[in-house]
Amino acid sequence: MKKLLIFSLIFSLFLTGCTNPTSGGSETTDTSEIIESTETDITTDVTEAPVIENVDYKSNFNKNSHLIDILGETADNVVVSDFSINMALSMALEGAEGNTQKELENYLNKTKEENLIYNKQLLEDAKNVRNIKLEVANSLWYNKTLEVKDTYKKLLEENYEAQIENVDMQDPATVGKINKWCSDKTHELIPEIIGSTDNIESVLINALYFKANWLEEFYEGATKKETFKGSKGDIEVDMMHSTEATYLENEHATGFIKHYYDGYAFVGILPKNEGAFNLTDLDIEGLIKSQTHKYDVKVGLPKFKVEYETSLLGALHQFGIKDAFDPNAANFEGIAENLFITDIIHKTYISVDEIGTEAAAVTAITMDNAAFAPEQKEVKDVVLDRPFAFAIIKTDNNNILFSGKITNIEQ
């Protein structure tokens, strides 16, 4: 079986996924025009799926792929929520000024004004789903001694629907309150985001919860024990099988699209070359634009569940966000005086089975007062290692909620 790539996005919900666990790749059979992605022959009626509009994916897909590649340098499995990360950084941007503002705008690829309008629309769109669960929550927790500007609090409440909490960061109970909020907003999938409030003056948090059934569920009787060639050796997995209508192929990869309800979809992507790979080399944008309904696509997707946690400081520093993390250069005067970012904690969860997908993410931006900044510790990114990636996308835009790379699957 080829190593697989599952690159899944959510508000651009797309998960790249698995194929042929035994044949070594996809091939076209001229006589029947069947794209073989697995050995098992599943005869299923394939519903004509809508084509994802060729909107400009380039900036979002390239940025997201690069982020996963950076985090994947030290990990097998990487799962990130671009949606959650961007929403949390957007709330920080609202209080940023000077060069700190410019660096955040460059990463988000929007001005402060454009970003505000954009995120308000995302929150409205999340409310308009009918057959899936897509829940977005924001909050600001700040120390009782910190003088946060009323204009900033009002902006978060009115535009990000944020919950504002003035708390005692010296009280150990505050940690429990913050973690309970995260647990509640993610339906207990992410029960904890911080372990201590020492040296923390404020925390900006985005929480995201997604649960969707497949438009056409996998037939449970077709799920078989098959071999997945992971980075740490072969492992037996529960491989789901179906026949899909949308085929993807470019110079670097093949793939398929399987739809959820309400215009979300899972995109499975299999690199043509076996072994380690970088997402940035696969041209995800071009692959999505290559979609065709000329074939029946026989696919295999392993059931999997992944929990992931990392600090984003090192990766975002490589994207040019520097002043925000420097106590001597950070400018968040729109929030309060002398604040700088001490950490950006990102946790995700995803589970994929015959019924559908459940996923959650929490991004917490912790800030401290530069006047009392402790000595900066070395930042370590804790992630997994290779060979497949994933994302979840909405089929009419390019907003990325979740994406990742999976190389080992625990049973």
Task: Set out the residue ranges of the language-model regions.
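N-terminal hydrophobic targeting signals that begin at the initiator methionine
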Residues: M1-K2
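Detector for small/aliphatic-rich hydrophobic stretches
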Residues: L5-S8, L13, C18-M169, I406
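Non-catalytic, conformational "gating/processing" segments within enzyme and secreted inhibitor domains
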Residues: A75, Y118-K272, T292-P374
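Short loop/turn microsegments at loop-to-beta-strand junctions
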Residues: D76-V78, T254, P387-F390
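Extracytoplasmic/secreted cell-surface and envelope-processing proteins
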Residues: T100-K102, G275-N278, Y308-T310, A360, ...
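Internal alpha/beta scaffold segment
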Residues: P271-H293
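C-terminal soluble interaction/assembly domains
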Residues: H346-T348, E354-Q411
